[in-house]
Amino acid sequence: MATKAIDVSTHNGNIDFNKVKAAGVENVIIRCGFTGYGRSHTLNKDARFEENYKKAKEAGLNVGAYYFSVALTEADALREAAFVLSLLKGKQFELPIYYDVEDVHDTSAAGVLPQNMQGLSKAQLTAIVNRFCDTVEKAGYFVGIYSGKYWFRDEMDMSVLNRYTVWLAHWTTQTDYTGPYGLWQYTDSGKIDGVQGNVDMSYLYQDFAPIIKRLGLNGFTASETPSAPVILMGDVNGDGAVTEYDALLTLRRSAGLETFTEAQNKAADMDGDGKITAADAREILRKSAGPED
């Protein structure tokens, strides 16, 4: 069942997160920072990041973070990743850390960078996004990518980036995006008690918090509680259902980014060859979609 989420930054002003929660929102993704459009490529902390994080946690919301990128090279992405890690240090996030990829700034304006991310080739942009996400992931964070439908479809090679969870921006009543996604931002003009003016709103389809906590990611200490027995092929996390998240865990395991129990390995080995591969992840993803017509 989907739950409601909002994403906020300093532009949303002073937020009453207790009212936000009372209005039925369970999740908030907070901008931690952004890279400026100027030629100096300045890395900036969001002016309300600390305040928003503290208040959202006190209100009992699930919290994630995002960083708005203007990276034009892999070196830029590494610089942004190091900055983001410094902002996240000492904090705990129940939701992923998202790389916001949507830069289309006017390159003809005075004093700004003469190129934007949309002007990069698919291979260049994919390498940049992968460099940032891989760096933050290896530092112990559950990482995702935020972008629009057409960017995911046309600007990035998602066969390379498919191990990262997707936060899809598509402002419509029903998205026709065909790729997997865990979060869907469906409007930039939502109204919610506790936030003045419009606010971005999303539906969250994946229950990230238990997985992040169990694996000891995003500032949490790994749970010492044994994993529940896995009794269903493809049900890697033992929740009784085969979902896209099981496929994601299996893909991460195939890349050496997860450690599975014996039971999890058996559940993930869809072809029975004794190995956990991307092919197993694809089969679990297919199974999660339900019976074929």
What is the predicted function of each stretch?
Residues 1-12, 22, 157-228:
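Functionally critical loop-and-helix segments that line ligand-binding/catalytic clefts
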